[in-house]
From Swiss-Prot:
Part of the FGAM synthase complex composed of 1 PurL, 1 PurQ and 2 PurS subunits. HAMAP family: PurQ. It catalyses: N(2)-formyl-N(1)-(5-phospho-beta-D-ribosyl)glycinamide + L-glutamine + ATP + H2O = 2-formamido-N(1)-(5-O-phospho-beta-D-ribosyl)acetamidine + L-glutamate + ADP + phosphate + H(+); L-glutamine + H2O = L-glutamate + NH4(+). The lineage of its organism: Bacteria, Bacillati, Bacillota, Bacilli, Bacillales. It comes from Geobacillus kaustophilus (strain HTA426). This is Phosphoribosylformylglycinamidine synthase subunit PurQ. It comes from the Bacteria. Residues 4-226 form the Glutamine amidotransferase type-1 domain. CDD domains: GATase1_FGAR_AT. Pathway: Purine metabolism; IMP biosynthesis via de novo pathway; 5-amino-1-(5-phospho-D-ribosyl)imidazole from N(2)-formyl-N(1)-(5-phospho-D-ribosyl)glycinamide: step 1/2. SUPFAM superfamilies: Class I glutamine amidotransferase-like. Coiled coil: none annotated. The gene is purQ.
Length: 228
């Protein structure tokens, strides 16, 4: 399986994402610059965290116009796994690949610390390695992680089981309905504010994020013929 890690000007979690795939999973991965216009050679696309284009206007507002985003949309439409973490989630929202919007944290401060999440839906290509209701520890690092959508959209998210992760216990940023991560209706585009790529080694505090990346690989292997 081959992963693409998209790098925008200002991305700063791309190396962590690369490490999770290459060193922890042993899968093939490649950095892709923001002006790339073809992602057909990849099986999954990862949009890392950071401060793309300095977060000017809004987080992700400029990055969504990058040349690579047309290729990201094409990958999503083809059913390939697309994961956006933190700033990557914000970019997916701005690009219309996921519903809703992101606001400043309720306390108007940047928050960087581990949080607990509840796995709300374990029947997705991103969460099959988890148990339903499993509580996991994943770090956050954001100033604009307060997810919001209108009432009708929230009803659809709940009805379609598109809410994949919720904050467990304390809600750190005021996010609507404690939402920490959602998928699109097709189930192949996931956006989440916590950083699973920073939770792949127990020595560093948690390895709970590794199951997310393993879920993607397991899904791909189950749906593709792998030859030696």
């Amino acid at each position: 399986m081959k992963f693409a890690v998209v790098v925008f000007p200002g991305s700063n979690c791309d190396v962590d994402m690369y490490h999770a795939i290459a060193d922890e999973l042993g899968e093939e991965v490649e950095y892709v610059w923001h002006d790339e216009d073809n992602l057909d050679r990849f099986d999954a696309v990862l949009l890392p965290g950071g401060f793309s284009y300095g977060d000017y206007l809004r987080s992700g507002a400029i990055a969504r116009f990058s040349k690579v985003m047309a290729a990201v949309k094409k990958a999503a439409e083809a059913g390939k796994p697309v994961l956006g973490v933190c700033n990557g989630f914000q970019i997916l929202l701005e690009a219309g690949l996921l519903p809703g919007a992101m606001r400043r944290n309720q306390g108007l401060k940047f928050i960087c610390r581990p949080v607990q999440l509840t796995v709300e839906n374990h029947e997705t290509m991103f969460t099959s390695a988890y148990e339903k209701g499993e509580v996991i520890t994943i770090p956050i690092a954001h100033g604009e992680g307060n997810y919001y959508c209108d009432e009708q959209t929230l009803e659809r998210l709940v009805e379609n089981r598109q809410i994949v992760f919720r904050y467990h216990g304390e809600n750190p940023n005021g996010s609507l309905a404690d939402i920490a991560g959602i998928v699109n209706e097709q189930g192949n585009v996931l956006g989440m504010m916590p950083h699973p790529e920073r939770a792949v080694d127990a020595l560093l505090g948690s390895a709970d994020g590794l199951k997310l990346f393993r879920s993607i690989v397991n899904y791909w292997r189950e749906t593709h013929v792998v030859t030696a």
